[in-house]
């Protein structure tokens, strides 16, 4: 029997699109540090982290993890949301932040929790990006 993970990924993607269609639109950009939904796909961390969220041009990141998110935002703006290289660079940036042993700006949303959530999100994005570039045989 063929693996069902591509079908499952499409179901999750469709669910995400539908849920985002019913939620209010995000503000145009963020000027304040946020720490919301840290253990879910709807995470908001710092000014730049989270699907659909970004800091305003020229805004300093809240911490090193938020800087990784800013750099990822810039990368996907240039190369597109399907850029696996952007997602891999983001994961590498998070690994460096973790290795440095610093503490983030939020006690409510510690690095360990936020990074685990973001890593899962990037793994899903990489899988969907790769799925979108493969030729399917019928």
Swiss-Prot record:
* Annotated catalysed reactions: a 1,2-diacyl-sn-glycero-3-phosphocholine + H2O = a 1-acyl-sn-glycero-3-phosphocholine + a fatty acid + H(+)
For the keyword Calcium, the answer is yes
Tell me which PROSITE patterns the record gives: PA2_HIS
Specify the signal sequence span.
Answer: 1-21
First-listed, main subcellular location of the protein, grouped into a coarse class: secreted
Q: Name one GO molecular function term.
A: phospholipase A2 activity
Catalytic residue positions: 72
Q: What are its cofactors?
A: Ca(2+)
Kindly list the cysteine pairs connected by disulfide bridges: 29-56, 33-62, 38-109, 49-69, 68-93, 75-86
According to the UniProt entry, what is the EC number of this protein?
A: 3.1.1.4
Q: Which SUPFAM superfamilies match?
A: Phospholipase A2, PLA2
So where does Ca(2+) get bound? 48, 50, 53, 73
- What does the entry's cofactor note say about binding and number? Binds 1 Ca(2+) ion per subunit.
Q: Say yes or no: keyword Cytoplasm present.
A: no
- Cell compartment(s), UniProt: Secreted
Which InterPro entries does the record cross-reference, listed alphabetically?
Answer: PLipase_A2_dom_sf, PLipase_A2_His_AS
* Cellular component terms (Gene Ontology): extracellular region
Provide the function of this protein.
Answer: PA2 catalyzes the calcium-dependent hydrolysis of the 2-acyl groups in 3-sn-phosphoglycerides. Releases lysophospholipids (LPLs) and free fatty acids (FFAs) from membrane phospholipids in response to hormones and other external stimuli.
Q: Which family does it belong to?
A: Belongs to the phospholipase A2 family.
Could you identify this protein by its name? Probable phospholipase A2 homolog 1
What is the taxonomic lineage of the source species? Answer: Eukaryota, Viridiplantae, Streptophyta, Embryophyta, Tracheophyta
């Amino acid at each position: 029997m063929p693996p069902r993970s591509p079908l499952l990924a499409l179901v999750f993607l469709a669910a995400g699109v539908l849920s985002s269609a019913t939620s209010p639109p995000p503000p145009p950009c963020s000027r304040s540090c946020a720490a919301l939904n840290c253990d879910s796909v709807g995470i908001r961390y710092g000014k730049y982290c989270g699907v659909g969220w970004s800091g305003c041009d020229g805004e300093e990141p809240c911490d090193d993890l938020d800087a990784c998110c800013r750099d990822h935002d810039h990368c996907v703006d240039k190369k597109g949301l399907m850029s696996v290289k952007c997602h891999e660079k983001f994961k590498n940036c998070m690994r460096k932040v973790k290795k440095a042993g610093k503490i983030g700006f939020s006690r409510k949303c510690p690095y360990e929790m936020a990074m685990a959530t973001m890593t899962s999100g990037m793994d899903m994005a990489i899988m969907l990006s790769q799925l979108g570039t493969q030729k399917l045989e019928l």
